[in-house]
Amino acid sequence: MKSSAVSLKKVRGGGFDLDELPSDERIDALMEKYLRRLRSALPKHKRATGRVPGAAIAVRKGSKVVHVKGYGCANLETGENITPETVFDLGSVSKQFTAFAALSIFSVAELEYPISKFFRGFPRYADKIKIKNLIQHTSALPDYLDLHVAARMSAEGWYDRVLKRPDDWYPLMPRRKKAKELTNKHVLKLVALQSLLPRAPEVNFEYSNTGYVLLAEIVRRATKQRLSKFLKENVFSPLGMNSTFVFDETSKFRKKAPELLHHARCYNAVKGKGFVPVGYSPLNFTYGDGNIHSTIVDMAKWDHYLTTLDRETILASDAPGRKREVNARSILWEPAKKLHEQQDEYGAGWYLLRNKYKDNVKAKNGRRVTKTFRSRAEYHRGEWLAWENYIARAQKWMLPAKGKPVDPETWESMGIVVLTNNTANAPNKEFYPCALGTQIAKLYWGNFFEDNIINGVNCALA
């Protein structure tokens, strides 16, 4: 295996600090409309306080972060507001970090290793599943969430053999008596009990949380470090993401722990009751597929760092006489197989959109000429309990003439992160996190973002 994440050590911070966070009044106006929508869900007896959960938003245009701000309440009981330092559960947005860890450890050739190299006790089908299949959701492994439900429905004795109560507990949430909580170790046991796969690996894309739990375990076995420690040392700390952490089996937090001082609570919108806090689930203890917690300012730093990778990749992609550099990190943006034609492609923890289009531009002589452009976007949703999140990144650039490199002046990019702590968005598609992100993007790129990059399907499929 190659040395891990050496290039990350050269990156310090995200290009801004908490004392200089920018704000855009147009986004403020949009988010005020969003908060009014949430307040409309309050019953009459709760409207006096006006307290509603909310969201945190970060926007980057080019290499400049133009907006980082929180809206609404992080905790309805205390009235604490959402700020750039408020911590959210990222849900499946966590997958991009797990994938990035794996791509920092393994070479392209090593991504072809069968997972049986790391899981000796797995059935024979593990010889046919490669590490890259876990990353790209082409392993054919059944989702452990489904296996968990099936186990609960089976004979209690069999279930108890697989699942034993651990000692961990989830931050800020009361533990329920007689709860049977699933951990990564239990997921491995559930997978090992599946004697056959429903289909062959690498045939189809099929979203599976199981693969990312296994990927977290592979990172641990390959580096002798838990995913939490590896990411902290090689990603979070070098990038200044000081409030971001993985909640794993070593996490025995208490309410006054530093990691939880600014942690939001999440709320379901219940008719007649307003917003009801949600927190406990016996599935709160698995990680790799989720369970990374972060702030909007930390996520802005992460997006800002990825922009440096974008620029290097795009500007070199069409350079004359230059071979495309092949490394594991480039697989971040490499698509796997599609499940069906209406689905966007998937890379390493990101859904992918690619497009080519024509546009009229002003030439040096002042005339308008038609040029061909390319666009590329990556996005992912993250939903868990009442946490609903969205991250999207987009680039566009003019294709150069044959034999010419890409002109950096034609390259534009944008990044948007939306973190929310409520489910009141779901009935109203206008304020669903991905739809909200599209509205924000239109403030900067007009209808281009929606017409050429976001195709309207991604909200349903991410």
Feature map (PLM): residue ranges:
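Glycine-rich His-Gly loop
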Residues: 92, 139, 420-421
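Short, surface-exposed loop or secondary-structure junction motifs
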Residues: 71, 126-383
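Short, solvent-exposed turn/loop segments enriched in Gly/Ser/Thr/Pro and often Arg
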Residues: 61, 65, 115, 122, ...
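Short active-site loop at a secondary-structure junction
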Residues: 48-56, 77-134, 197-211, 287-290, ...
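Catalytic loop of the DD-peptidase/beta-lactamase superfamily, centered on the K-T-G motif
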Residues: 4-73, 225, 232, 274-462
